[in-house]
Amino acid sequence: IRVYCFIFAASNVSVQELNHSALYAIIDVETTGGQARYERITEIAIVLHDGQRVVDSFSTLLNPERSIPWSITQLTGISDEMVANAPRFFEVAKQIVQMTEGAIFVAHNVSFDYSFVREEFARLGFAYTRKQLCTVRMARKVFPGLPSYSLSNLKRHFGISAERSHRALDDTLARVNVFERIL
């Protein structure tokens, strides 16, 4: 086990707190755009990791109750037709709370994913608060000197294959792989 001394700016979680007995909710969201206040989630994936292995997972398309811009459909492959009969966020909110309760919210650029999940809960009148951990910041500290810390570059660097980029479950599984290398 590697031990590093630093605090992540996005949270109060330090590398010393990374251990093989904590629960981590590794999450990715796909959205209708880049600003959580104005845009909505179209897909969410959560993979629970106990510090040693994956223990549970959840993934679903979500009906954002608005049109998905063409540029987003081109990027993610998620279309209005695909989400037309998908659940709305409020229909899966309880499951998201239950899966992430007591877990550290882990994402690649955590401020993006966390802000969208938090904003969706705020629209429902609920505060969503979790400790957060950013795999971008972690990777910069643990693997210094890489030309880029984007998920696609880390996948290339570590030889991680993924079926489809910009789909929540595939990106989350790639994040799990990066996360395990950091642990």
Regions found by a protein language model. Give the residues of each.
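A short, structured active-site edge motif that brings together acidic residues
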Residues: 130-140
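Conserved non-catalytic scaffold segment of RNase H-like nuclease domains
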Residues: 4-131, 144-166
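Short Asp/Glu-rich motifs
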Residues: 92, 140, 174-175
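Acidic, divalent-metal-coordinating active-site segment for phosphoryl/phosphodiester hydrolysis
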Residues: 167-179
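Short, glycine/acidic-enriched loop or turn micro-motifs at the edges of active sites
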Residues: 31-33, 137, 174
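Mixed-charge, glycine-rich, non-catalytic linkers/tails in nucleic-acid processing enzymes
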Residues: 182-183
